[in-house]
Amino acid sequence: MTSQQAHAIPDVQNLNDSRKLAIDKVGIKSIRHPVRVSDKNGGVQHTIAVFNMYVGLPHNFKGTHMSRFIEIINGNEREISVESIEPMLREMVKRLEAETGQIELTFPYFINKSAPISGVQSLMDYEVTFTAEIREGGAYTFTMKTVVPVTSLCPCSKKISEYGAHNQRSHVTVTAQTNSFLWIEELVQLVESQASCQLYGLLKRPDEKYVTEHAYDNPKFVEDMVRDVAGLLNAEARIDCYRVESENFESIHNHSAYALIECDKRLVVGAN
């Protein structure tokens, strides 16, 4: 196809739209691409992220150019790093002639953990989502979301039972908008410190005894979990606003217990 023939193909997306309704987000979802993420120990993890990429569409455009999203994600390097997200986002907004844009990437992240007694090491995986956003006026924000699996033990069950107490695996999800760099490991450790007990990939018998007894000594309702985590998030100056959720997959019910706290510390008098 000659360049003259290419120019003759109609560009429907650039046509005016008579409905005059702007679209908040339009783009592509669920595209997989390699990424590399630096870890706190000085290493680099190579993993696969699922990307969502959106821009705001002005009311006068009929559609956006979907192929440009793919060009942008493949344009600069084979692997995308955390450091390259903001430049990529700004390029996306510019090329698509938008005022707002958002890139989300979700990936598994691994932390090497030592069992509490034997010291045997194993990997634990955590689901992490980075969200980079440009809002009207060009303001840039970065949000990190981490799902941390932990153990919770019911205080009521412990109180009313002659022996034992029901416990279960729980997911504590923290979504934090940051004003400066925060390691994934720091957010994970913050959450795990407030659980009845943290989880490990590998445990020997002395370790299993320890985690069972540790959970029994630290019973927590789902309400306790979000309040205790929120207290530490309030004290973390690098976090401007957050959402903390806890879902307990109840071992004696066929439903989950759930609690949530949201806070924009910039609006709270006396906050850091």
Curated annotation (Swiss-Prot):
Keyword RNA-binding: no
The organism's place on the tree of life at top rank: Bacteria
UniProt-listed GO biological process terms: tetrahydrofolate biosynthetic process
Biological function: Converts GTP to 7,8-dihydroneopterin triphosphate.
Matching InterPro entries: GTP_cyclohydrolase_FolE2, GTP_cyclohydrolase_FolE2/MptA
Protein name, entry field: GTP cyclohydrolase FolE2
Family: Belongs to the GTP cyclohydrolase IV family.
Tagged with keyword Hydrolase: yes
NCBIfam families assigned to the protein according to its UniProt record, in alphabetical order: PRK13674.1-1
Keyword terms, alphabetized: Hydrolase
Pfam families noted in UniProt: GCHY-1 (PF02649)
Species this chain originates from: Aromatoleum aromaticum (strain DSM 19018 / LMG 30748 / EbN1)
Entry EC no(s): 3.5.4.16
